[in-house]
């Protein structure tokens, strides 16, 4: 079985695959102080509660939080007796290399999402990921990542507004009943919701114009469904896009005799 691990700035997600069959997914908050032993106890407990067997013989990691990777490597080495692939490291091969400026480091999650989306939806894509940052990734005709856009994430924007303006409360984002708010909470919710609708529409339109061709828009991330309420922003929403991409990259490395 394959263990896929995706570490973001907010959450770390684990999934297990038996070949191409998805077995399960579990999520924990990202904490660089968490040890390999703690990860194992947590993961093995959840897996046993679902009456699954922990027969892991391969691991792959994608991480935007470098301080966490060390303990995840130890987890894979100590408890599963395997050397994990780490996306973005020289020993982890990619099916198609990104085409960006020399010296540019592309977030591994963006590379993983690019290939996962290409495998499912074909060429000429814009992948919108609603994470800690809201990212737009452009996928070329051969599946290569060719650049994109990074904007503050929804929750990050809410937190910044609350922290930067003492009189403004922290609110949950939701689709407001109308654009013009008649109280502070409604005004903030409207600004965030309609602001991000406009952000997505505007950036997608400009990417399509710059590329000069039709492009499908694939959304992922926990907040993606919030912005898919009759606005025709997305051609598809993929909840498990990163995990799917990690499995594909692992399988590619295996085919190439690497891992």
Curated annotation (Swiss-Prot):
Q: Which residues form the active site?
A: 109
Q: Where does substrate bind?
A: 107-110, 184
Example of a GO biological process term: coenzyme A biosynthetic process
Q: What is its main location?
A: cytoplasm
* Localization in the cell: Cytoplasm
**Catalysed reactions, semicolon-separated:** (R)-pantothenate + ATP = (R)-4'-phosphopantothenate + ADP + H(+)
EC number in record: 2.7.1.33
Could you tell me which InterPro entries the record lists for this protein? ATPase_NBD (IPR043129), Type_III_PanK (IPR004619)
What this chain does, per the record? Answer: Catalyzes the phosphorylation of pantothenate (Pan), the first step in CoA biosynthesis.
Q: What is this protein called?
A: Type III pantothenate kinase
Q: Which organism is it from?
A: Paracoccus denitrificans (strain Pd 1222)
Starting at the broadest rank, the lineage of the source organism is: Bacteria, Pseudomonadati, Pseudomonadota, Alphaproteobacteria, Rhodobacterales
Gene name linked to the record? coaX
């Amino acid at each position: 079985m394959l263990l896929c691990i995706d570490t973001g700035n907010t959450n770390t997600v684990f999934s297990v695959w038996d070949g191409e069959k998805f077995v399960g997914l579990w999520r924990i908050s990202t904490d660089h102080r968490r040890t390999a032993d703690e990860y194992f106890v947590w993961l093995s407990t959840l897996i046993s509660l679902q009456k699954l067997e922990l027969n892991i013989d391969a691991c792959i990691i994608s991480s935007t939080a470098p301080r966490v990777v060390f303990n995840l490597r130890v987890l894979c080495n100590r408890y599963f007796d395997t050397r994990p692939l780490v996306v973005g490291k020289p020993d982890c091969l990619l099916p198609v290399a990104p085409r960006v400026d020399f010296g540019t480091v592309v977030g591994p999650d963006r590379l993983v999402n690019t290939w996962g989306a290409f495998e499912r939806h074909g060429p000429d894509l814009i992948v919108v990921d609603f994470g800690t940052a809201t990212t737009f990734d452009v996928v070329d005709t051969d599946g290569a990542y060719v650049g994109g856009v990074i904007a503050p994430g929804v929750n990050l924007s809410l937190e910044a507004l609350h922290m930067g303006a003492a009189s403004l409360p922290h609110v949950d984002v939701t689709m407001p009943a109308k654009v013009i708010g008649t109280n502070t909470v409604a005004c903030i919710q409207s600004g965030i919701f309609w602001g991000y609708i406009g952000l997505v529409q505007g950036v997608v339109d400009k990417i399509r114009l710059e590329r000069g061709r039709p492009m499908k828009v694939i959304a992922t991330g926990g907040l993606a469904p919030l912005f898919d309420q009759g606005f025709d922003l997305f051609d598809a929403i993929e909840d498990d896009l990163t995990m799917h991409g990690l499995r594909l990259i692992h399988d590619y490395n295996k085919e190439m005799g690497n891992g």
